[in-house]
Amino acid sequence: AQMGCASTLIGHCEERNDKMGILAEAGVTGQAAAQAVSRILNQEIKCAQAAGLTVLYCIGEKSEEQADWENVLGAQLDIGLDGVDKRRVVIAYEPIWSIGPGKTPADKPYITKIARFVKARTGGLDVVYGGGLKQDNAAMLASIDEIDGGLIALTRFSGEIGFYPDEYLDIIRRYLGK
């Protein structure tokens, strides 16, 4: 906050995965590790808020967790948001199973189902989509009433993978319907 930052990203799937790996080395795995990671992230959220930052809190399920998505996402929300100022939190949903080159993106009914669940579980917090908002799905994502925006890290997921400003602007235009 002292450097002019207003918000921070906490709990990105890669961050969660790194923390799970550290816990696995210590012999903690499965649900116990997932809950421990959410408790660590909860402390990160509290520290960020104490510093005056708004938090973009990422949640998501892996392919092997899809059948149990309600419990997985519910625990991430309940533990991660315990005792925090929810007025200063936005939820970023990352369907981990669908992120990356060659993966099948989550479809509109699935994303809608998850966003409704998150809003119901959190008392209506804003939900942004973090599972690959790109040119070919921006309009579809914008058409989901329960989605309040998107998280864009890369603009190109194949070939020359990376972030390209012109493509970023095109994604925004398509999301806004322009």
Q: Where are the regions a protein language model picked out?
A:
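Structural motif
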Residues: M3, A51, I144-D145
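Catalytic cores of alpha/beta
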Residues: G132-I147
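Conserved anion-binding
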Residues: H12-K103
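Glycine-rich phosphate-binding active-site loops on the catalytic face of alpha/beta enzymes
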Residues: S7-D18, R88, P95-W97, P101-K103, ...
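Glycine/Thr-rich beta-alpha phosphate-binding loop at enzyme active sites
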Residues: P95-D126, L133, I161-F163, E167
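Structural preference for beta-strand elements that scaffold enzyme active sites
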Residues: A6-S7, T54-C58, R88-A92, D126-V128, ...
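C-terminal helical cap(s) of enzyme catalytic domains, especially alpha/beta-barrels
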Residues: I22-A34, R156-K178
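Glycine-rich beta-to-alpha transition loops that act as phosphate-gripper elements at the mouths
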Residues: Y129-Q135, L154-T155
